[in-house]
């Protein structure tokens, strides 16, 4: 198992959002989590991605005990091993597409030359080489989200965590992005965990998990 979590609990004040969640994901799987708004999907994704801490429970990612790490160690692990794609691209407006993709690699300690070469390779693979010098304001919605995908991939993460990744796109760009996810999983062997309301995207994944009342169900 590349992700294994047991009895994950999380409360905000008196509101218990996660009530003892168990989840296990194999390497190379694409798994979707669906459910109504407020069911706890994003909270769970943030905990699995080390962006937030559970109140209690166990979490191992690729054999590493995450709960025992301090914040600095978690941040280092996150930048090396995990990639994130959000509904809104979160590109830095003052930087070019190429520079946005390079940022996680630079944070990981790679040289500027190495980061640039890898970012250029990814942009080429995603048919975005001609947009490398453009800033986010000069890109379409679909292009910005593909730049965000390249940024998520630049450190060769074992796992990609995506929260409503196509929620802000039109139908044509959604189809394009979904096809890209499946291609990456097939060609690069990466594991994808996707929170989505998009029934078509969920239907194409290896497994669909349903979140209800703070718990996960496989149906």
Swiss-Prot record:
What Enzyme Commission number(s) apply to this enzyme? 7.6.2.-
Cross-referenced SMART domains, in alphabetical order?
AAA (SM00382)
Domain of life of the native organism: Bacteria
Q: Name one Pfam family in it.
A: ABC_tran
Instruction: Please indicate if the UniProt record lists Cell inner membrane as a keyword.
Output: yes
Q: Which InterPro entries does the protein's record reference?
A: AAA+_ATPase, ABC_transporter-like_ATP-bd, ABC_transporter-like_CS, MacB-like_ATP-bd, P-loop_NTPase
Major location (coarse): membrane
Per the record, membrane topology reads: Peripheral membrane protein
Question: What's an example of a GO molecular-function annotation for this chain?
Answer: ATP hydrolysis activity
Sites where the protein binds ATP: 35-42
Instruction: Please describe the quaternary structure of this protein.
Output: The complex is composed of two ATP-binding proteins (LolD) and two transmembrane proteins (LolC and LolE).
What is its biological role? Part of the ABC transporter complex LolCDE involved in the translocation of mature outer membrane-directed lipoproteins, from the inner membrane to the periplasmic chaperone, LolA. Responsible for the formation of the LolA-lipoprotein complex in an ATP-dependent manner.
Protein name according to UniProt: Lipoprotein-releasing system ATP-binding protein LolD
What broad taxonomic lineage does this protein's source fall under?
Answer: Bacteria, Pseudomonadati, Bacteroidota, Bacteroidia, Bacteroidales
